[in-house]
Amino acid sequence: MSAATAPERGWKSEKVDEAQALARSCAARRPDFQPCDGLSICATHSHGKCFKLHWCCHLGWCHCKYVYQPMTPVEQLPSTEIPAKPREPTNTIQISVSLTEHFLKFASVFQPPLPPDSPRYCMISDLFIDNYQVKCINGKMCYVQKQQAPHSQKMSPEEVSAHDALISKESDTPKLGHCSSPSGSEDSGINAIGAHYVESCDEDTEEGAELSSEEDYSPESSWEPDECTLLSPSQSDLEVIETMETTV
């Protein structure tokens, strides 16, 4: 064991000698450096005991370092008198108040915009102002005016006599069948001339149930006049004559 420790001691001594030589060369440039006696003395340096720069050899390396200075008691530290009240008035509070007032004056500008109004929904039928029916006449979709409720007002004698004369005149002319145009061909359902439409199309014949072709269409054809006033096709109620699904 002694043989194993002898080379180790020799290697350590060589390192220490090399470190000390480096430390001396370092200390030679600084007159305030003083060499330590060895590792043991460097290890025993404690706070408040060394007052100069020393070099220490630790594991073969040279460390030039400052050692701690003695601590000064707290009672001996210089102190500054703190006045109980500020000698000069400060404007900190006044500035804060003025800034707050200035902000509140223009606060409305920084407010977020009002939320938009919620969308208002309406029924499609509310967008229309008149009253028509949609009927399937002879396989075609037609706008037919709805019958208005009978007026409760009584007609004057002059109106009654004029109405009877009109009825007798109409009885002399040949009647047209329902759901047929005066020309004998099926109308497209929309009267381009502006005449009235027939309300009742309940009596369909086999001949009228057949779909008409475009050749039979007569733009000058019109339906038998009705006593109701003419309105535009909107706010329509759906009535299906024949087996057909339709929508307004």
Curated annotation (Swiss-Prot):
Residues 169-248 are annotated as: Disordered. The keyword Aminoacyl-tRNA synthetase does not apply. InterPro entries: UPF0524_fam. Residues 200-227 have a biased composition (Acidic residues). It comes from Mus musculus (Mouse). Keywords: Neurogenesis. Belongs to the UPF0524 family. The keyword NAD does not apply. May play a role in neuronal and neurobehavioral development. GO terms for biological process: circadian behavior; nervous system development. The lineage of its organism: Eukaryota, Metazoa, Chordata, Craniata, Vertebrata. It comes from the Eukaryota. Transmembrane segments: none annotated. This is UPF0524 protein C3orf70 homolog. It holds the Pfam family UPF0524.
